[in-house]
Amino acid sequence: MLFPSISDTDEITRITLTRPTIGDDLPDVLGVFALSSADGMDDLPKQSPRPTPLLVEHSEDVFLRPGIRGQRVSVDSLGSLLAGTAWSPRFVVSNTFGDEDHLTIDAKDDDAQLALRTELETLKGGTLRVRHTLTNTGDSEYLLDALNVHVPLSDDLTEIMDFTGRHEHERDPQRRAIADGTWLRECRYGRPGFEGQIMVAGTPGFDFGHGRVMLVQLAWSGNSTLEVDRNSSDEAGINAGELLSPSEVTLGKDESYSTPWVMITASNAGLDGISASLHTWQRSLPEHPAKQPVILNVWEGVMFDHNLDRLLEIARRAARIGVERYVLDDGWFHLRRDDHAGLGDWWVDPDVWPEGLTPLVDAVHKLGMEFGLWFEPEMVNPDSDFYRE
């Protein structure tokens, strides 16, 4: 089975699966490709040396890191905790449906009392996105530790690139050859870090314009895990999913958990090819046609010194040179006279703005500009009412 069907002559990511048949095991992924033309089916890149499903299961004799890790827990008649069951499910296909751009595979393990839905969708520009949804169909709770999408690597993709970094040194690429074992990148900030949630595998020496490459990226703003796993049998792949804390996801009867969407993009023309694919999709979104305004942020101009007359003069000058959105930055909220206090108290400080922000907002609007307001909701100062309360 080839999914999705050919619909564009540009370079498109393809995923080839064994046919998902009712009652069979999860379909194997035979290869993930980027075609330089719609007629390129006879010249596909190499496939994985051994096909693996989009969810790694040890019950299928694929001894990479399992894609689902968890166990069922219950209490017996004496009140003792029973755990350690349903930790290695074997899913069989129960239903499939889809169209040219979508494929959904439902599977279940009646013994483990778990149901799995895998969704695949092709996006404009060639990017493919995949996610799993796990449902507990049993009466006892299921403690889920991990649920990851597995993307197999063909044996010519032997080099990986990911990113590290820090403030003012963001997105520093680091490269290495794939070796037996696991290369693990975890983000524990509760948000994407400077290193991002990206893993690229490619032919040796790939660069912006050359080489066959495949990108795996999580469309997710929380904790994440990306791992490249290869065993001594030359089975290799990238696993991607949310990094779950202990007992963070405990599924009661009929409760479900969905992974973030995992984006898969491939190119036969280096990193620029995968960038072009993602950009094409982003430009197709309903929000994209909106005009991006010219923005002035007043931070460097006034810092914490919020003086209405000065800010109004900046607004008048901004309007004269064509600024379309005027943004008031740090310093407008409670206690915020320097960077040691106030974060978390997101209300207008009456000592600085006795009439509120209305005079400035009205003036900006009369000058024909939008008004924007800066705040940093993920941060807090110990010297704030929010923190003390």
Where are these predicted regions, by residue range?
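Long, charged amphipathic helices and adjacent flexible linkers at domain junctions
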Residues: 277-289, 294
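Polysaccharide-binding surfaces and accessory modules of carbohydrate-active proteins
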Residues: 1-229, 245
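Glycine-rich, acidic/polar active-site loops that bind/position phosphate-bearing ligands
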Residues: 246-251, 269, 321, 370
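Short coil/turn motifs at secondary-structure junctions
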Residues: 123, 137-139, 266-267, 378-380
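Short Pro-Gly-centered flexible turn/kink motifs
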Residues: 249-268
